Amino acid sequence: MAGVSFTTVSHVVNNSRPVSADVRAKVEGAIRELNYVPSAVARSLKARATATIGLVVPNSTNPYFAELARGIEDQCAANGYCVFFCNSDDDPVKQRNYLRVLQEKRIDGLIVASAGEDTVLAQTLADAHAPLVVVDRNIEGLAADLVQIDHERGAYLATRHLLELGHAKIGCITGPTDTAVSAMRVHGFIRAMAERSVDIVPGAIAESDFSCLGGYHAASRLFESVRPSAIFAGNDLMGVGALRAAAERGLRVPDDCSIIGFDDIEFSRYTYPALSTVGQSVRALGEMAAQTLIERIGGGASAAPSRRRVVSPRLVLRESTAIYREPAPAGNRA
C-alpha cells in the first residue's frame, strides 16, 4: 500500500535506520489505515524478552492479594512491564498448569504467592526456568528471591498489645495449620503469651481458613467455649468475621471483647468499629516484590545470590481494642 519494501517498513516501525520524511509519512499512513499492530511474538524472538511478568496468587477474592497485585502492577507498569495475572484457587494442580502456560508465553520473570507443599512446589517453580520472586513465605529447597512481612513478629506485637491492655484470656484465630504463614503467626502469639507467663486457655486457638466466614465461625466457637476478653485474628478478614460474631451475641467491641487482625488491608479501616491490626502497606509489599524481580531480570537470573527481604510490621491501632474491664454483673450492663 505504501509502495515500499518490508525492510523499509521494519525500519520505520522500529526506528532502526534513518528513513526520509516522505517515506515515513507513507508508511505511517498505511499503518493507520490498516490498523497494523507489530507482532509482540516476533519482537520477543529477536530481543529474547517479552516485557511481561507472570503473577500467581492463591485467592483473588481475598483483598490482601488484590492490593498486593495492584502494587505489583503499578511498579511493573512504571518500568515498562505488563503483568499476566493468574488465580490458583489454592489448588496446586491449577497453579502448576498456570505456571506451564506462563512459561509458554515466554515471560521475563515470575512472582508467586504460593499454594501447595514445599517439595513439589520447589520442583515446579524450579522447572519454570525464569527469574523468580516468592511472596509471603519461604519455600524450602528453592533458590529464589523472597519478599515477606515478618509474620511471627507481627503476631507477637498484636498479642503483646492485648496483654498490655490487661487482657489475659485471649483467643487466637489461625489460618489452616498446615500453612507456613499460619504457623509463624501462631508462634508469635504463643511467644508473647509465654513472655508474660500467661497461660493459654485450652481451646483458645481456633483453626480457620483466612476468610470472613471462617473467622465468624471460629470466633463463634470461642465465644461459646472460652469466652475470651480479646481475640487475635490471624488476618483482617477473620477479624471482620469475629466482629460479626461478637455483634450477634450482643458483645460490644471493644468494651466486652477487643479484636485485632493482621495485614492492614484497606477494608479494615471501614468496619465498625474500625479494626485494629498489625502489618505493613500491602501495596508497598507488592511494589517491593516487583522491583526485586525487575532488578533480578536486569542483572541476569543468576547474577547474584538469592535475596531475602523481610518487612518489619507495625501496629495500627484503631477502635476495636481497649483496656480490659471486668465483666459487669448480669443485668447491670449499661
Residue spans for each PLM region:
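Short beta-strand segments enriched in small/hydrophobic residues
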Residues: F6-H11, L45-T61, H161, K169-P176
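Short beta->alpha connector loops
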Residues: D89-P92, A113-D118, L237
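Short, conserved catalytic or interaction motifs in soluble domains
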Residues: N14-N15, Y36, S88, A115, ...
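Bacterial carbohydrate/catabolite-sensing allosteric modules
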Residues: E33, G71-C82, N97, Q103, ...
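N-terminal helix-turn-helix DNA-binding module of bacterial transcription factors
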Residues: M1-A51, R333-A334
